[in-house]
C-alpha cells in the first residue's frame, strides 16, 4: 500500500480541483506544409466524470485533433482551456494513449510506468511505490519485472494505461486504444475501462475517446460528437442516456448505433 503522504507530496492520486474540464474554442488545423484545412471551428467541452467520444470517417483528422488537444502540436486557430486556464504547452494534467501500443521493450513493466513520473520529479523509492500501486490498479500485480515481449497485447496496453494515469492527469485522451487487440482482449478492456479510469484512486476527471467502432462508443460514452465533411466539423452531438452496464441486447443500444451511423453518412 502506498502511504497517503507520498500521494499528497507529489499530488498523485488526489486532486484539489472542484471542476475539471477541457474546453476547446473554434479549433482549426492545417498541416504546415499544406494549405488544406483538416478540421475547422471545433468547439466543445467535457464535464467532470464524463467520457466523451469523437467519431468520424477516416481522414477527418480525429487523431490529429487529440494531438492538438494535448498540445503536442499547436492549432492553426483557436484556444484550449483546462479548468478555465489556457493551455499552450504539453502538461502532465493531460495524458494521451496512442492507438499503437507504446511500451519500451528494453524496460520492465514497472520501469515503463515509472518513466511517466519523471515529469513530477518524484524520488526513486517513492516512484516505485506509486508505480506498483498503479500496476495493481490495472491488474498487473506479479508482472512488475516482466518485459513487454513476455506479455500479451492486452497486458502491454494495461501498462500504457498505468503509465498514463500514474502522473496524476485530470484528462485522459484515448486514440483507438483497442484497435490492435484481438476481439476477446478488446472486449475485456472495454468492460473495465470506464471504472478503471474513473477509479477513486486516480485523479482523472474526464476522458475523450476517438474510435471507429460505434458499438464500442455506445458502450463507453456519456456523450458523442460526430465529425464529418472536408474540412471536418461537428455535425451532430448525441447524449447516450443508458444505464451501465450496457447490453447489446437492449434495442436502445442499437438505436444509438444507428443514430451515429446516420451522422457519419452525412456529406458522403
Map each language-model feature to its residues.
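Conserved ABC ATPase "signature" region
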Residues: 114, 125-143, 192-198
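The feature captures the beta-strand-to-loop junction immediately N-terminal to the Walker
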Residues: 55-57
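Short helical segment in ABC ATPase nucleotide-binding domains corresponding to the A-loop/adjacent helical element
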Residues: 110-118, 128, 239
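Conserved ABC transporter NBD signature motif
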Residues: 78-90
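A short, proline-enriched helix->beta-strand linker immediately N-terminal to the Walker B motif
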Residues: 166-170
Amino acid at each position: 500500500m502506498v502511504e497517503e503522504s507520498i500521494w499528497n507530496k507529489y499530488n498523485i492520486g488526489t486532486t484539489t480541483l472542484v471542476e475539471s474540464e477541457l474546453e476547446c474554442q473554434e479549433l482549426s488545423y492545417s498541416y504546415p506544409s499544406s494549405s488544406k484545412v483538416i478540421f475547422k471551428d471545433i468547439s466543445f467541452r467535457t464535464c467532470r466524470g464524463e467520457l466523451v467520444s469523437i467519431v468520424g470517417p477516416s481522414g477527418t483528422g480525429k487523431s490529429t485533433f487529440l494531438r492538438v488537444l494535448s498540445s503536442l502540436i499547436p492549432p492553426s486557430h483557436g484556444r484550449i482551456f483546462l479548468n478555465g486556464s489556457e493551455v499552450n504547452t504539453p502538461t502532465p494534467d493531460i495524458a494521451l494513449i496512442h492507438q499503437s501500443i507504446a511500451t519500451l521493450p528494453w524496460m520492465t513493466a514497472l520501469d515503463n510506468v515509472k518513466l511517466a513520473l519523471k515529469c513530477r520529479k518524484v524520488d526513486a523509492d517513492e516512484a516505485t511505490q506509486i508505480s506498483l500501486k498503479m500496476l495493481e490498479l490495472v491488474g498487473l500485480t506479479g508482472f512488475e519485472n516482466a518485459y513487454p515481449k513476455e506479455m500479451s497485447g492486452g497486458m502491454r496496453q494495461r501498462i500504457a494505461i498505468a503509465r498514463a494515469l500514474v502522473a496524476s492527469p485530470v484528462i485522459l485522451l484515448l486514440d483507438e486504444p483497442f484497435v490492435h487487440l484481438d476481439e476477446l482482449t478488446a472486449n475485456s478492456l472495454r468492460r473495465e475501462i470506464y471504472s478503471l479510469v474513473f477509479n477513486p484512486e486516480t485523479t482523472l476527471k474526464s476522458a475523450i475517446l476517438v474510435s471507429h467502432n460505434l458499438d464500442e462508443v455506445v458502450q463507453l460514452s456519456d456523450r458523442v460528437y460526430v465529425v464529418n465533411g472536408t474540412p471536418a466539423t461537428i455535425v451532430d452531438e448525441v447524449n447516450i442516456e443508458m444505464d451501465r452496464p450496457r447490453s447489446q441486447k437492449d434495442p436502445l443500444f442499437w438505436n444509438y448505433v444507428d443514430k451515429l451511423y446516420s451522422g457519419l453518412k452525412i456529406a458522403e
